[in-house]
Amino acid sequence: SIAGFLLILSQAFSVVANLLGGYYADKFGRKKMMVISSLAQGISYLIFALASSPWLDSPAISFICFTVISLFTSIYWPASQAMVADVVKEKDRSSVFAIFYTSTNIAVVIGPVLGGFFYKDYRFFLLLAAGLLNILLSIVLKIWIAETAPPYKESVGTKKNWIMALGTQLKDYQVIVRDRTFLMFILAGVLIGQTFMQLDLLLPVYVDEMVATQSLFSIGSWSLEIQSTQAFGLILAENGLVVAIFTIMVTKWMSKYKEKNVFIVSSFIYAMAVIMFSQTNLIWGLMFAMLLFSFAELMTAGIQQSFISEIAPENQRGKYFAAASLRFTFSKMIAPLSIPMSAWFGFEWTFLIIAILAVISAFIYYVMFKQFEMKKRNLQAVKQL
C-alpha cells in the first residue's frame, strides 16, 4: 500500500512537471528544456546507480531519483513534441509523429527485456549506463540541435516572484481550457483511453480467469499447448509487433482521409474489438480481436499529435502538447476501476461499458470536428474581408 501511494504521489508530481514543462518550452525554448531534462535525468540515474550499488543500498534515495527522473521525463516530452511541430511541415507531421510513435513502442518492448536480463544481477551497471547515455544525449542536443521556438512575448510589468509566475502559468493554461475544441479532444481521449489502458488491467485478468489451456495449432500427433499466462503474452506481443511494423504504413494510409472520419472510425473499431474480447475464450479469437484493437490504435497514432499542432497557436505549442498528455494521465487514474467492476458486474458487462465509452468518444469527436471546421471557416471569412 505504501508503494502504491508513493507511485500515485510520483504521478501527481509528473502532472505538474508536464504542465510546467510545456510553459517553459514556450518561454525559454525547446532545446534548453530538452538539454536540461536530459542532463538532470542522467545525473539522477547516476545517483540511482550509487543508491543501488554494493557500497550503498538506499530505497529512499532510489525513490527520490525515480521521481526526479519521472519529473524531467515529463518536462522533456512537450518540448520535444513542440520542436517536431516547429520544424516539420503540416502535411508531413502525421508521418513524422508516426515514426516517433514506432520508435517509442520499440523502446517500450526492448527496455523491459533489457531490464529483465540485467536489473536483478547487474542493477548498478544498468543504471550507470542509463545515466551516461542521458548525459551523452544532453551533449548531443546542446551541440548539434538548433533552437526552433518562436520569440516569446511576455506581458510588460513588474518583475514577478515565483508565486506570481506560477499564477501567470495557470492563467496561460486557462486560455487552453477555454478552447472548446481542445477540451473536447482531451475528453474524447480520456474516454477512448479506457479501452487501450485495459491491456495492462482488465485483459490479463480476463485471460487468466477465462482462457483455459488449449492447443494453438497441431501437426499430426504433436500440438503446441498454450496456458493462460502464455496466451496473454502472445496477444500482447502481437500488439507490439503490429505497432512496430505497421505504424508508418497505416499512418500514410490514414492521411488520405479526413481526420474526423479517422478518429470516429477508430473509436468504433476499438468498441468492436473490446466486445469481441468479451465474447471469446479461444486464443485465435483473442488474437483476431487484438488485430482489430491494434489497427484502431494505429489509425490515430500519427494524426493525434499532428492535430494538436494544428489547433495550437505557434507560440503555445509546448503548453498544448503538455495539456494534451493529461488525457493519458486521467485515463490511467480512471482505468483501474475496471477491475472491481468486473467483480461487481462480470467481464461481459464491464467490457460492454468500456465499448460504450468508446462509442461516446466517437460522438464527441464528431461534435469537436464540426465545431473546429466551423471555426476555420469563420477565420477564413475574416481574412477575406
Residues of each region from the PLM?
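Residue-level signature of mid-helix packing/kink "hotspots" within the transmembrane helices
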Residues: 11-19, 108-109, 240-248, 332-336
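Conserved MFS/SLC helix-loop-helix module at the cytosolic interface between two early adjacent transmembrane helices
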Residues: 16-53
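Helix-to-loop junctions at the C-terminal end of transmembrane segments
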Residues: 17-30, 245-259
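C-terminal ends and interior cores of transmembrane alpha-helices
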Residues: 39-56, 268-281
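Hydrophobic core of transmembrane alpha-helices in multi-pass small-molecule transporters
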Residues: 44, 57-75, 285-299
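Cytoplasmic helix-loop-helix junction between adjacent transmembrane helices
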Residues: 66-104
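Helix-loop junctions on the cytosolic side of multi-pass membrane transporters
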Residues: 138-157, 367-381
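Juxtamembrane intracellular "pre-TM" segments in multi-pass secondary transporters
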Residues: 148-186, 382-385
